[in-house]
């Protein structure tokens, strides 16, 4: 059900022919070139540009999304889990393995004296800005929904908010939050788009366990067989394996009996025994000996038993409640001492909670007092609702327009990179006074980059980025606009840049949603200077082809920082060729087996950076075709005649990193979506534009397979 404040018209998927380029040129060109094929004049500003706060999408107002949607479980339905009978199960899987991150290398850190052992966990509102709160929509038409682009700092991402059980009647799910019977489930399946994005960047992604929940018998979780196994434990491991996430955040926040808490510990110990990679983080709430709710605000002898022992763990870590700074452990030394006394590394097992849901840029917890460049933190840190700024602003309509989202992306940059927006100059510029006051003043917050070193998955070539953050008001392929309406799918985003944005000289950088080379965004550059892009650990004996697509720039150079000479940057000029509205800059660098520790660009002129690629070899590593491509009708759209929901399936292709699905019409093609699995649900497809569809596999170097077609009967 739509809120009366939300526009009732269905977002359009317009077929475009841009700069005279139609179906043949687009598909043939993209299939024959490694990531950089069709270049044409810049397209029109997307239709989303005109959105205003007068009629905006109201967060958590629309009930159940069409098609796939993650949900929650309680014991009665958890034990009945069977993917063969679960609607849309294949659409909720993450097939992306968790990337390996390179080892720390201090000379190329934004802060060389920042301790890389300090970790970061987050509890993030998965639905910030989305109209779907009861059950999130993994792929949708919502450019106003938040997507994370600072994965380089996150070690453990956790879902927050709570989703409604799939056994709850639809009419109740569609009711406002708090309605009697609209009950959140105990165990939340994490939204697969978040899991995919986390894994691409080497982070863990965990679901949620939320207690109390009304109408649920807690003892149902604690049933134990005679052989010592737990049916719920077996089923949780099965579910994690099928859906591809990494574990659970245990928010056990109501007292239970001593007998129950003893069984609960045994359940978690059993899970860790049969699946050591099942990551469990416990919130500092219920005590492990008595079952009583008692926030300790410190890791101490009362709650440390939740960790078990190094040889037989119960939990992997504890999220320490927020009262540590004004309470028993202001310097976190007691927590660190307790962890070490029990054989644990405190940075691995103790995460000091910081409450951003209320504090935003000025939380009461001052982790920066015990952490920062030159100050090794005793423990790691956990952020509660790091994206609260987006949720709050979305409630007043600020996320509904491109201009509004630009402001929110700027706030996001200040949150993660510090008040200057540059991670190598992070650190608060206004002294701390009282927490949870003046919460929108970003000068009061250090920025996460002041506490946590950037992590990197860039240990091998190719490295390709078009600065796609997994949402946008339009979509472009090769400089051609092939969609002029909004979309979101965080799982389709590129891997995060290592720094956003570490620049030198008078260069200013911002994320721009009005134009792109591929995806939904580009980087707008003003002035001249250096932009550091990727922290790497690369070794190659041959050459590294370099390709850069940009508009308006008069000069582009690529800079290599060698690991054996980290104090200097080795600069190489790129040669540009004008093709329509984008200039392709390129060169080929000889690496000769030396280790590359960082890749940077030096530019002159105002313009846009659309795509960068650092390739493994001169040839194209094209993926195989996505065979077995089919399309089926998945339901009508009541608000628009001739518009249908569609479901697509195909076989995974060798060498494929992702897949683009497009609609083919007489006027051109329309991009429907990009996914990293073998199924795709497309919402609200206008069939008057055509009933022929195509899928193309995309390789790691950005090259495209030959298209495979299917027609809707």
Can you say where each PLM-predicted feature lies in the sequence?
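N-terminal module-boundary/linker segments of secreted carbohydrate-active enzymes
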Residues: 46-141, 145-148
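Extracellular fibronectin type III
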Residues: 702-713
């Amino acid at each position: 059900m739509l809120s009366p404040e939300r526009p009732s018209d269905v977002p359009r998927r317009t077929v475009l022919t841009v700069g005279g380029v139609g179906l043949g040129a687009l598909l043939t060109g993209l299939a024959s070139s490694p990531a950089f094929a069709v270049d044409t004049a810049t397209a029109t500003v997307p239709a989303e540009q005109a959105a205003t706060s007068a009629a905006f999408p109201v967060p958590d107002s629309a009930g159940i999304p069409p098609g796939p949607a993650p949900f929650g479980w309680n014991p009665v339905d958890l034990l009945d889990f069977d993917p063969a009978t679960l609607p849309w199960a294949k659409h909720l899987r993450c097939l992306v393995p968790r990337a390996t991150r390179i080892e720390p290398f201090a000379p190329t850190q934004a802060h060389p004296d920042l301790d890389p052992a300090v970790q970061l966990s987050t509890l993030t509102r998965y639905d910030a800005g989305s109209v779907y709160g009861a059950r999130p929509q993994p792929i949708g038409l919502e450019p106003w929904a938040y997507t994370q682009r600072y994965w380089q700092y996150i070690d453990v991402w956790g879902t927050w908010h709570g989703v409604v059980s799939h056994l709850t009647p639809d009419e109740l799910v569609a009711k406002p939050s708090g309605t009697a019977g609209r009950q959140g489930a105990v165990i939340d399946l994490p939204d697969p788009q978040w899991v995919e994005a986390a894994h691409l960047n080497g982070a863990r992604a965990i679901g949620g366990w939320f207690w109390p929940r009304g109408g649920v018998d807690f003892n149902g979780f604690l049933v134990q067989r005679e052989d010592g196994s737990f049916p719920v434990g077996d089923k949780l491991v099965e579910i994690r394996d099928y859906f591809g996430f990494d574990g659970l955040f245990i928010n056990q926040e109501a007292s239970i009996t001593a007998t129950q808490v003893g069984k609960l510990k045994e359940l978690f110990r059993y899970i860790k025994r049969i699946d050591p990679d099942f990551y469990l983080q416990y919130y500092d709430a219920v005590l492990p000996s008595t079952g009583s709710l008692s926030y300790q605000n410190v890791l101490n002898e009362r709650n440390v038993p939740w960790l078990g022992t190094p040889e037989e763990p119960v939990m992997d870590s504890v999220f320490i409640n927020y009262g540590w700074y004004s309470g028993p452990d202001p310097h976190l030394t007691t927590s660190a001492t307790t962890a070490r006394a029990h054989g644990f590394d405190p940075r691995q097992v103790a995460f000091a909670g910081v409450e951003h849901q209320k504090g935003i840029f000025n939380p009461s917890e001052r982790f920066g007092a015990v952490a920062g460049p030159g100050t090794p933190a005793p423990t790691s840190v956990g952020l509660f609702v790091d994206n609260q700024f987006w949720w709050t602003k979305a409630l007043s309509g600020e996320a509904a327009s491109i201009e509004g989202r630009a402001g929110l992306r700027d706030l996001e940059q200040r949150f993660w990179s510090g008040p200057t927006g540059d991670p190598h100059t992070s650190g608060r510029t206004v002294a701390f006074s009282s927490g949870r006051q003046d919460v929108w003043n970003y000068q009061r917050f250090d920025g996460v980059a002041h506490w946590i070193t950037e992590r990197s998955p860039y240990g091998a070539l190719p490295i390709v980025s078009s600065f796609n953050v997994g949402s946008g008001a339009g979509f472009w392929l090769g400089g051609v606009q092939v969609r002029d309406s909004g979309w979101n799918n965080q799982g389709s985003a590129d891997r995060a840049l290592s720094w956003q944005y570490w620049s030198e000289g008078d260069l200013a950088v911002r994320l721009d949603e009005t134009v792109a080379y591929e995806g939904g965004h580009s980087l707008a550059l003003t002035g001249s200077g250096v932009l550091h892009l990727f922290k790497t650990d690369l070794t190659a004996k041959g050459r590294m082809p370099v390709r850069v697509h940009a508009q308006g720039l008069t000069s582009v150079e690529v800079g290599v920082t060698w690991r054996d000479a980290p104090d200097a940057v080795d600069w190489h000029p790129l040669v540009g060729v004008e093709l329509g509205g984008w200039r392709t800059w390129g060169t080929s660098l000889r690496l000769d087996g030396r280790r590359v520790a960082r890749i940077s660009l030096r530019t002159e002129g105002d313009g846009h950076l659309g795509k960068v690629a650092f390739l493994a070899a001169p040839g194209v590593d094209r993926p195989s075709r996505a065979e077995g491509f089919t399309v089926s009708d998945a339901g009508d759209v009541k608000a628009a005649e001739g518009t249908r929901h569609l479901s697509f399936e195909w076989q995974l292709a060798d060498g494929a990193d992702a897949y683009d699905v497009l609609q083919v019409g007489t006027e051109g093609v329309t991009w429907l979506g990009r996914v990293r699995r073998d199924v795709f649900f497309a919402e609200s497809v206008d069939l008057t534009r055509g009933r022929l569809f195509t899928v193309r596999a995309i390789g790691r170097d950005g090259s495209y397979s030959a298209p495979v077609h299917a027609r809707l009967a």
